[in-house]
């Protein structure tokens, strides 16, 4: 079976992760003690993707939980599904990273990383055919960003041919948790560009907007935000866990979404959006799902796809529906909004269909888009970074942990390069692409003469 190993790090990562396991357990009919309570055999058919079956018939998540302080771990452990995890897979320190990337990446995190890798190795050896890793973390803090990226690079060394998928929560434009978020995020992106295969970009502000605007929640809690994220996470991998007409896995997803290796930061969306309490009673139609899914207000990160163009996109539909209708709707979207898609990648929208809908819904869809407008996120973080770095504000916290100012400069320029790469492909047209080739030929001819 094609297993996925789930890793969650830091406070944010652990809270998202805990919510994710609640959703996946519900989908597979597994209760909080790890016993199967479902009625449908399909729930067990590929339960191995995320679970290891223990000898006593219990299902144990293939999850590694890490943090540099015990607090969040304790709340996960005492949460509704806390008893389902393998106790050895909780790896935590006592010191905390204090929102400092350098502590997570170089000092505190580096001391703990070997024990995390041991657990990862043990879990990977339990797999029949490991497909890849999914990492949940935030980029604004210290542990998720610093230690998270350290772990990703170590796993990259040890398992170079396995997919690395991350769910990364970026600092929000208006809601800031700490002042050094731009530093932590820039240093993390620098790592993610090189070491991750696919990054799902999330941010709290966009999630707040969805909760407030669409779900009509007056005071959204982090629980509500994480509920949205976990619905998307479950949608991304539903094709691996349930049968369907058009299946996809992490690698197929990457092949279809990433035209240039560095441009692997995706916007995600989910439809139908339902508030936690009121699961919708009316069945949606495929056209309605498609429309809601492509809606800019539905994107879970603060970048507006209408300000850029889609290089590629992928949609996963779940529920009983006709593949033909799905294809027609997707082609319809592309024809009506052709200016929002680059014309030099033909057939750049892929759809997959999975027969089993999420719990409580008749149909649902998950959207993943590789849009050039994601540069807005990077641009914003980069501006905040530059504003502080020019004055060398708060830098002693990082240099005190043994970091060099050069690293900051490198990370900054790598992020700016990323922004200009997105911009370059946003502006590129089909004719230009051909034009470049001719120019090169002429140069060669001159040299021969």
Swiss-Prot record:
GO molecular function: GTP binding; GTPase activity; metal ion binding; mRNA binding; structural constituent of cytoskeleton
Superkingdom in the source lineage: Eukaryota
PROSITE patterns: TUBULIN, TUBULIN_B_AUTOREG
Gene3D superfamilies recorded: Helix hairpin bin, Tubulin/FtsZ, C-terminal domain, Tubulin/FtsZ, GTPase domain
Biased composition (Acidic residues): 429-449
Keyword annotations from UniProtKB, A to Z: Cytoplasm, Cytoskeleton, GTP-binding, Magnesium, Metal-binding, Microtubule, Nucleotide-binding
Binding site for Mg(2+): 69
UniProt-annotated location(s): Cytoplasm, Cytoskeleton
Subunit structure as annotated in this protein's UniProt entry: Dimer of alpha and beta chains. A typical microtubule is a hollow water-filled tube with an outer diameter of 25 nm and an inner diameter of 15 nM. Alpha-beta heterodimers associate head-to-tail to form protofilaments running lengthwise along the microtubule wall with the beta-tubulin subunit facing the microtubule plus end conferring a structural polarity. Microtubules usually have 13 protofilaments but different protofilament numbers can be found in some organisms and specialized cells.
Assigned protein family: Belongs to the tubulin family.
PANTHER family linked to this entry: TUBULIN
Protein name listed in UniProt: Tubulin beta-8 chain
Organism: Arabidopsis thaliana
